[in-house]
Amino acid sequence: MADATEKAEHDRIFKKFDANGDGKISAAELGDALKNLGSVTHEDIKRMMAEIDTDGDGYISYQEFIDFASANRGLMKDVAKIF
C-alpha cells in the first residue's frame, strides 16, 4: 500500500497525463505525455495501453493507473522526476 507521499505523487502524475481532466487517460493523452520522455512510437503506446488498460475499455482509469504504479514503483520514481 502506498503511503500519503506516494499517493500524492501518483495523483499528481495521473492528473498530468489526464490532460482534459475527465478522470481517465486516453491513448492520445498517454502519447502526448510520453513525448516528454523521448521518442515513443504508436506501437509503444498501443503496447502500454494493452498492459495498463486491464478492462479493455480504451482508457486508463485512475485505479488501473494506481495498480500499474504499485507494481512498477521504480518506473514511477523515474516518471515522477520528469513530471
Swiss-Prot record:
The lineage of its organism: Eukaryota, Viridiplantae, Streptophyta, Embryophyta, Tracheophyta. GO terms for cellular component: cytoplasm. One of its GO terms (molecular function) is calcium ion binding. It holds the Pfam family EF-hand_7. The keyword Repeat applies. It comes from Arabidopsis thaliana (Mouse-ear cress). Residues 5-40, 43-75 form the EF-hand domain. Potential calcium sensor. Keywords: Calcium, Metal-binding, Repeat. This is Probable calcium-binding protein CML28. Ca(2+) 1 binds at D18, N20, D22, K24, E29. PROSITE patterns: EF_HAND_1, EF_HAND_2.
